[in-house]
Amino acid sequence: MAISKASIVVLMMVIISVVASAQSEAPAPSPTSGSSAISASFVSAGVAAVAALVFGSALRI
């Protein structure tokens, strides 16, 4: 059974939205701490880039 590219992108979006909601519920880190938390905007930009690569390879413009 082949998994379509659209279902992979939807699965990635669901996972990222769950992670982003978990991060938004967590308390904010101290300004002096060196935490390397990934912002939800960076994650969504990464998803957009991956989706462009996945669907861009199928499109011939």
From Swiss-Prot:
Ranges that cross the membrane: none
Keyword Magnesium listed: no
Highest rank taxon of the organism: Eukaryota
Compartment(s) of residence: Cell membrane
Alphabetically ordered keywords of this record: Cell membrane, Glycoprotein, GPI-anchor, Hydroxylation, Lipoprotein, Membrane, Proteoglycan, Pyrrolidone carboxylic acid, Signal
Positions of modified residues (4-hydroxyproline): P27, P29, P31
GO CC list: plasma membrane; side of membrane
PTM description: Contains 4-hydroxyproline; hydroxylated on Pro-27, Pro-29 and Pro-31.
Glycosylated residues in this chain: P27, P29, P31
Extent of the signal sequence: 1-22
Residues lipid-modified (GPI-anchor amidated serine): S35
Propeptide segments, given as residue ranges: 36-61
Major localisation: membrane
Membrane topology: Lipid-anchor; GPI-anchor
Residues recorded as bearing Pyrrolidone carboxylic acid in the entry: Q23
Tissue: Expressed in reproductive tissues. Expressed in chalaza, funiculus, stigma, septum, style, integument and transmitting tract.
The family this protein is said to belong to: Belongs to the AG-peptide AGP family.
Role: Proteoglycan that seems to be implicated in diverse developmental roles such as differentiation, cell-cell recognition, embryogenesis and programmed cell death.
Protein name as it appears in the record: Arabinogalactan protein 15
Native organism taxonomy: Eukaryota, Viridiplantae, Streptophyta, Embryophyta, Tracheophyta
Name of encoding gene: AGP15
